[in-house]
Amino acid sequence: LQANRDIVTEICSKLRGLNQNHVIINAVNPVDVINVVIQDCTGLGRRQIIGFSANDTLRLKWAVAKVLNIGADRVDAICLGEHGEKTVPLFSRIFIDQKHVRLDARQKEAVLLETRSWFSRYQALQSGRTSGWTSGVQLARIIAAIASDSGQVLPCSVILDGEYGYRAVSVGVPARLGARGITEIMELALSGEEQGQLDGAVKKIHSLLQSIRN
């Protein structure tokens, strides 16, 4: 964290004198913390800083599809929270072919097992290849949404200012993207359990921010 903060701070210091209408797409981990570092260093508006966090949602969709034995293209789902261990899968918002479905406890546990163990299982294959292309595809979608001013909604880490009840912290949420960056932050209704998990994610991110500010 400290090393990445120092690198990002050095880069951002060179942006201060440039036109302030640009949008920054951040893929440096821990992305939620680094988003705030970027804003502190550049002074840009929060809607001009977009953190890459889409892979958590992709893994959730893939896991749901595997557990239900269907194609992943039929699944609509999303993760909120930290881009990392404290990601919050919204089981209350799982859709198959645009129809809401409820997973039972066994299915939820199986989905969580898939999402939490995918990396270790991939490493065990020793394929000599990378799964990093998925990040490239998702980053391209963010760029395309900005370049075309499409208004597409994508999962991103966004600095909040009252949304979901939080301020001055960057968290993964669905955001509408356009030419100026983030045009709208979508606030989803959460279950009590999901809200509690999101609170835990925010607490962890705040703690990491505090550790590099002391």
Where in this protein do the model-derived segments appear?
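C-terminal substrate-binding/catalytic lobe of Rossmann-fold NAD(P)-dependent dehydrogenases
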Residues: 41-50, 56-214
